[in-house]
Amino acid sequence: MPTINQLIRKKRQSSASRKKSPALQKCPQRRGVCLQVKTKTPKKPNSALRKVAWVRLSNGQEVIAYIGGEGHNLQEHSIVLVQGGRVKDLPGVRYHIVRGALDCAAVKNRKQSRSRYGAKRPK
């Protein structure tokens, strides 16, 4: 417990809240280049091979981003758009790649939740 004199000399510091997506630096999305595209296995009760990409953003930071949807066309040197949003069962994956933007193709034959996957309205 500090004394009153100590509090006068140095005020109490309010703890800054932790940012959920610090690499975006308050931007809604950022452009980046894929360094490698791999699969990761999820945390304990789940089992799958989730597709992720290591991306170097336009601000120079490197992040791991999740590639949503069934099938993708990404490879090394692909230009992608990255937005915030973690994947609950993949530790360290705090970003999503936007489907249907830049080099990342939209999901084919998608009928529902199309806007999330960049799919056009079927005729």
Curated annotation (Swiss-Prot):
UniProt feature, compositional bias: Basic residues: 8-21
Keyword Zinc: no
Modified residues (3-methylthioaspartic acid): D89
An example Gene Ontology molecular-function term: tRNA binding
A biological process term (GO) from this entry: translation
Segments traversing the membrane: none
rRNA-binding keyword on record: yes
Origin: domain of life: Bacteria
Disordered: annotated segments: 1-29
Keyword terms: Methylation, Ribonucleoprotein, Ribosomal protein, RNA-binding, rRNA-binding, tRNA-binding
GO cellular component terms given for this protein: small ribosomal subunit
InterPro entries in the record: NA-bd_OB-fold (IPR012340), Ribosomal_uS12 (IPR006032), Ribosomal_uS12_bac (IPR005679)
Stored PROSITE patterns: RIBOSOMAL_S12
Known function: With S4 and S5 plays an important role in translational accuracy.
Family affiliation: Belongs to the universal ribosomal protein uS12 family.
NCBIfam families, alphabetized: rpsL_bact
Subunit structure: Part of the 30S ribosomal subunit. Contacts proteins S8 and S17. May interact with IF1 in the 30S initiation complex.
Protein name per Swiss-Prot or TrEMBL: Small ribosomal subunit protein uS12
Organism: Chlamydia felis (strain Fe/C-56)
Gene name of the encoded protein: rpsL
